[in-house]
């Protein structure tokens, strides 16, 4: 909702800290893990099913980045991993890789009886994701794994603080995701971010936190829209695609929309839309809410 780009390592190194306000939505990724004990499948083979199917004998040969880094880290014996999600998530801007990564860490650690708390999973998740996406920031991993509407502060020493915000605030809206139909590479966009311009995003976080605490809906919506305008100025790639520019203009003109912004690094994915809680007109947008649990783990 506010502060995106200040969670990037380069920004934190330059300015000492970064901060965001975010929430996990109730669109999930799922990892199911199966260990063959009866020999019905190959006992010495790793099987991964996602948009592709992989069958390998060594983890180093796994093409799926998430499956490979997690299984290698835990030195996990051969298992079957199945990846599922509620929406098509590749290049979506919905932090799907971080969500899958946290779910995979949870599934494998549970399978191996390795006890890990949420913060330990976040620290490991960030370390592992940076092996295949070195520019990834803090907010995706920590935002996916921690519950509710909150402010996260990322410090230069690597520590992260969590401050929960009033849970009922977002009940005053109906929230939607509008797909752009455009997939994008977050790495390309993140590498183009101007950290000097991103500094202007930090004040929005503290002001928005204050508005939420005071239940000031009008101020919250104004800050969200204003921060989106500043966000667009931090990189020419955020709205590089003409279709995105057209959609952005269209959303501004829609009187039912109180505020909107593009999710993720930019240049594709989904727009997040806020409407009044009493809005009842049919829409093609995907309705969302705040996730009751940040991640789900299924162990078979």
Positions of the model-derived regions?
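Glycine-centered small-residue motifs that form tight turns
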Residues: 18, 268-269
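Stable alpha-helical structural segments in soluble proteins, enriched in small hydrophobic residues
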Residues: 99-111
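Helix-loop-helix module between adjacent transmembrane segments
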Residues: 90-92
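C-terminal nucleotide
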Residues: 6-13, 22-23, 30-75, 85, ...
